[in-house]
Amino acid sequence: MPGDVEGCQHLKLKPADVENYQKICTQIFSCHFVPRRCSTCKRINKRSIRCLSCHSVGCLWGHHGEEHAMEHTHMIGVDVKNGHTYCFGCQDYVYQTELETLRFKIKNIKAWQSDHKRLPEKYNQMVCLEAYRKYPPVCATAGLRGIQNLGATCFMSVILQSILHNPLVRNLFFSGFHTSTDCKRPTCMTCAIDDMFSSIYNSKNKSTFYGPTAVLNLMWKLSKSLCGYSQQDGHEFFVYLLDQMHTESGGGTSMPCTCPIHRIFSGSLKNVVTCLDCKKERVAVDPLMDISLDINEPTLQGCLERFVSKEKVQYSCHSCGSKNAIKQLVFDKLPPTICMQLKRFEQNNFAMSTKIDKQVSYPAFLRMRYNFNQDDVDYQLYSVVCHKGTLDTGHYIAYTYYQNQWFLLDDTTIVEVKESEVLNSQAYLLFYHERQILYSDEMTVKTEN
């Protein structure tokens, strides 16, 4: 297990690197003039990385930055939009204390703002960064903060954002169901999540972003599969996080579980097998923590209908011995919060993982029915996780609904966006919460962000 939670194996700072980083950040945050055009394709891109070792600029998603890095062994670069450090060897943003401290100081020095009036002649060919910022920057506020990338941890950040903006989870932690100051466990993930809620929703906290070092340290200690700086899957971390908090909140193995985490995220799914000859049914009920959908339809509704559609199976009937049967999945109980995974990663005939880039449309409001004859349940979309790039060289971003407005969260960067952008994005994970929650027979509470 790594002994340090910052940097990466490729980030070995030299004095010249720190000096170059200071110059790049000064250009970004003082005069807003910085080389943004890719040195190879000459295009201006949303994500451009400037080499820390030389003056080359490469587009991130066009792979020209990566080609330069591999050719010259210049693995470390700087995002010209925000000054964050990017490693082409790890294929993700990385965190280093000295550089991040320097970036933060430069960003807040007001004296540099007038320097653009005295730019040397060589800067005439540079591109004004402000002219190509699609959206105005959003100031962090209580409840809305970016999460720092500590080195290939964007998969973790997007899931933490979905947890932070789930109104049921938020109310659960605000109710004091678990407080880190009272917990006696030496290692407790729920304590780390409680501290995260306290920090991010604290109006007196003036930090523009949150550093999830405690969550990362605990994840490395408690989960071998998620340990290290290699590329990880956001859905796998989501499943791990719920299971860990379920265990720490007193949840057992018997189902249905009544722990607070399962009350929010867990439902049940019926697996019904019907013999085609004698019509006898075999019914098995399994817990439902999320829904993994094959991308065979252009809409989410179509994918859900395919998920519960009947299919012929080979089955040995205990009553008549027939081998012919029909299997169907039925939503037995729908949870207050649903996570839907669009299965974008699959293995081909050569046992290699590939990514499916097919577009699937999904609504802001979703109506679902369970157990055939039950009433419909209305859900509202509150968080979307997207995976950019390829399986091995990708990056996670999230959209979240907060105070009646959608925001794009890209590590520490926060921008306000229109709902149309969210609904047109290529989603990997969709998070819906029930629009109306019945806490008891006498009380109905609406969940509103």
UniProtKB/Swiss-Prot annotation:
InterPro entries, sorted: Papain-like_cys_pep_sf (IPR038765), Peptidase_C19 (IPR050164), Peptidase_C19_UCH (IPR001394), USP_CS (IPR018200), USP_dom (IPR028889), Znf_RING/FYVE/PHD (IPR013083), Znf_UBP (IPR001607)
Residues the entry annotates as binding Zn(2+) 3: 51, 54, 68, 74
Q: Classify the main location.
A: nucleus
Q: Where in the cell is it found?
A: Nucleus; Nucleus, Nucleoplasm
What's the subunit arrangement here?
Component of the 1.8 MDa SAGA (Spt-Ada-Gcn5 acetyltransferase) complex, which is composed of 19 subunits tra1, spt7, taf5, ngg1/ada3, sgf73, spt20, spt8, taf12, taf6, hfi1/ada1, ubp8, gcn5, ada2, spt3, sgf29, taf10, taf9, sgf11 and sus1.
Gene3D superfamilies in the record:
Cysteine proteinases, Zinc/RING finger domain, C3HC4 (zinc finger)
**Source organism per UniProt:** Schizosaccharomyces pombe (strain 972 / ATCC 24843)
Stated name of the protein: Probable ubiquitin carboxyl-terminal hydrolase 8
Q: Which residues form the active site?
A: 154, 395
Residues engaged in binding Zn(2+) 6? 275, 278, 317, 320
Q: Which residues bind Zn(2+) 5?
A: 246, 257, 259, 262
What Enzyme Commission number(s) appear in the record?
3.4.19.12
Question: What keyword terms does UniProt attach to this protein?
Answer: Hydrolase, Metal-binding, Nucleus, Protease, Thiol protease, Ubl conjugation pathway, Zinc, Zinc-finger
Q: Which family does the similarity line name?
A: Belongs to the peptidase C19 family. UBP8 subfamily.
Q: Which reaction does it catalyse?
A: Thiol-dependent hydrolysis of ester, thioester, amide, peptide and isopeptide bonds formed by the C-terminal Gly of ubiquitin (a 76-residue protein attached to proteins as an intracellular targeting signal)
In its UniProt record, which GO terms are filed under biological process?
Answer: protein deubiquitination; proteolysis; regulation of protein stability; regulation of transcription by RNA polymerase II; transcription initiation-coupled chromatin remodeling
Q: Name one GO molecular function term.
A: transcription coactivator activity
Q: What is the lineage of its organism?
A: Eukaryota, Fungi, Dikarya, Ascomycota, Taphrinomycotina
Q: What does this protein do?
A: Histone deubiquitinating enzyme component of the transcription coactivator SAGA complex. SAGA acts as a general cofactor required for essentially all RNA polymerase II transcription. At the promoters, SAGA is required for transcription pre-initiation complex (PIC) recruitment.
Q: Which PANTHER family match?
A: UBIQUITIN CARBOXYL-TERMINAL HYDROLASE
Q: Which SMART domains match?
A: ZnF_UBP (SM00290)
Residue ranges of every copy of the USP domain listed in the record: 145-435
User: Where, in this chain's numbering, is Zn(2+) 2 bound?
Assistant: 38, 41, 59, 64
Q: Which residues bind Zn(2+) 4?
A: 178, 183, 188, 191
Q: What does the record's free text say on domains? A: The UBP-type zinc finger domain is required for the interaction with the SAGA complex.
Task: List ligand-binding residues for Zn(2+) 1.
Answer: 8, 10, 87, 90
